[in-house]
From Swiss-Prot:
Family: Belongs to the bacterial ribosomal protein bL28 family.
HAMAP family in UniProt: Ribosomal_bL28
Biological process according to GO: translation
Molecular function GO terms recorded: structural constituent of ribosome
Superkingdom of the organism of origin: Bacteria
Name of the featured protein: Large ribosomal subunit protein bL28
Entry-linked SUPFAM superfamilies: L28p-like
NCBIfam families: L28
Pfam families, A to Z: Ribosomal_L28
Entry's Gene Ontology cellular component terms: cytosolic large ribosomal subunit
Keywords assigned: Ribonucleoprotein, Ribosomal protein
InterPro entries per record: Ribosomal_bL28, Ribosomal_bL28/bL31-like_sf, Ribosomal_bL28_bact-type, Ribosomal_bL28_sf
Length: 78
């Protein structure tokens, strides 16, 4: 399972750890992903999405029905 938010598309990005001496070592910044069940009132069922914390806020703002319509338009499975 890839580390990508299904709602926002957030994915890991590369960067550096910096020590006190400013030595740079490569690292990855991972999105804050959670598998979360959302109740879809129109379909009378739960839908499980892998979303970031920001994705959950987007769902709270727009509503799950609108977000699922966007996912369907992109051709993404859920």
């Amino acid at each position: 399972m890839s580390r990508v938010c299904q709602v926002t598309g957030k994915r890991p990005v590369a960067g550096n750890n910096r020590s006190h001496a400013l030595n740079a070592t490569k690292r990855r910044f991972l999105p804050n992903l959670h598998s979360h069940r959302f109740w879809v009132e129109g379909e009378k069922r739960f839908v499980t999405l892998r979303v970031s914390a920001k994705g959950m806020r987007v769902i709270d703002k727009k509503g799950i029905e609108t977000v699922l319509a966007d996912l369907r338009a992109r051709g993404e499975k859920y």
